[in-house]
């Protein structure tokens, strides 16, 4: 079970981290999501 569940969740977290990185490069988006972007202003 663990081996089968690892791949989809890894793909999902990769997509999420890519989306978050894109968001954090935009001041308006990173300002609205400080917890995603390290909480830095």
From Swiss-Prot:
Keywords: Acetylcholine receptor inhibiting toxin, Amidation, Calcium channel impairing toxin, Disulfide bond, Ion channel impairing toxin, Neurotoxin, Postsynaptic neurotoxin, Secreted, Toxin, Voltage-gated calcium channel impairing toxin. The keyword Disulfide bond applies. Changing residue 33 to A: Loss of inhibitory potency on alpha-3-beta-2/CHRNA3-CHRNB2 nAChR (Lt1.3-II). Residues 25-27 are annotated as: Ser-Xaa-Pro motif, crucial for potent interaction with nAChR. Residues 1-21, 38-41 form a propeptide. GO terms for molecular function: acetylcholine receptor inhibitor activity; calcium channel regulator activity; toxin activity. It is found in: Secreted. Coiled coil: none annotated. The modification Cysteine amide is found at residue 37. Disulfide bonds join 23-29, 23-37, 24-29, 24-37. Changing residue 32 to A: Loss of inhibitory potency on alpha-3-beta-2/CHRNA3-CHRNB2 nAChR (Lt1.3-II). The keyword Nucleus does not apply. Changing residue 36 to A: Loss of inhibitory potency on alpha-3-beta-2/CHRNA3-CHRNB2 nAChR (Lt1.3-II). One of its GO terms (cellular component) is host cell postsynaptic membrane. Expressed by the venom duct. InterPro entries: Conotoxin_a-typ (IPR009958). Lt1.3-II (C1-C3; C2-C4): Alpha-conotoxins act on postsynaptic membranes, they bind to the nicotinic acetylcholine receptors (nAChR) and thus inhibit them. This toxin potently and selectively inhibits alpha-3-beta-2/CHRNA3-CHRNB2 (IC(50)=44.8 nM) nAChRs. Lt1.3-I (C1-C4; C2-C3): This isomer inhibits GABABRec-coupled Cav2.2/CACNA1B but has no activity on nAChRs. Belongs to the conotoxin A superfamily. Lt1.3-II (C1-C3; C2-C4): this synthetic toxin shows no or very weak inhibition on alpha-2-beta-2/CHRNA2-CHRNB2, alpha-2-beta-4/CHRNA2-CHRNB4, alpha-3-beta-4/CHRNA3-CHRNB4, alpha-4-beta-2/CHRNA4-CHRNB2, alpha-4-beta-4/CHRNA4-CHRNB4, alpha-7/CHRNA7, alpha-9-alpha-10/CHRNA9-CHRNA10, and GABAB-Rec-coupled Cav2.2/CACNA1B. The cysteine framework is I (CC-C-C). Alpha4/7 pattern. This is Alpha-conotoxin Lt1.3 b.
């Amino acid at each position: 079970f663990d081996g089968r569940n690892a791949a989809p969740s890894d793909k999902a977290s990769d997509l999420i981290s890519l989306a978050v990185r894109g968001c954090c490069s935009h001041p308006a988006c990173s300002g609205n999501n400080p917890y995603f972007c390290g909480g830095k202003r």
